[in-house]
Amino acid sequence: MTNKKALINKLSQPDNLRKILDEKSFVPIPSCFDALSAKLIEQANFDVTFMSGFAASASRIGSPDLGLMTFSEVFDQANNICNAIEIPMIVDGDTGYGNAMNVRRTLKECSKAGCAGILIEDQLAPKRCGHTPGKDVVNREEAFDRIRAASDMRNEGYDILIMARTDANHTHGLGEAISRSQKFYELGADIMFIEAPKNKEEMRTICKEVPGDKIANIV
């Protein structure tokens, strides 16, 4: 067993992810879609993987990322991945599959399965890939309720890092997206995700004005 694997086995997956984020200023996180792709990422010596809803939907049901996969299907995919690898995995929890009560259950089950983190976003259900036209976001209070519910559930003992995503940049502009992300951080989110910055200047502004860890994706 390698020293890296020995360390992982001593820590919970959320704590291991926290340690990685604390120790490194930049962490590449390749996306997986099933147990095999996750194992290949692990064997390539990456520290973390992310179960992409976009990729999982294509792989499992052969359909685009339009909110067609059920929570049960997503959970089954995430559970299989967690059982196959030792590096931490962040699961794409989409909108939480309903209201705040659904978000609580989604987080609880993903935490019990061994996920290190979970993404919860503010799109209107049924959601769609963040890089496609026609998407919309819920109002501020509903968006905040989702992250508040996730934080409350974590504080009840179901440890997991919360990645709070907003798609408001596309529909309401960068200022609204930053404002939502700042509130997500106040509510307990660990990683802030403003979807689809339009250019490098927007990315610089996000890094300057949004607290906590930040993530950007490359499709």
Residue ranges and their predicted role:
Residues 2-219:
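Alpha/beta enzyme core
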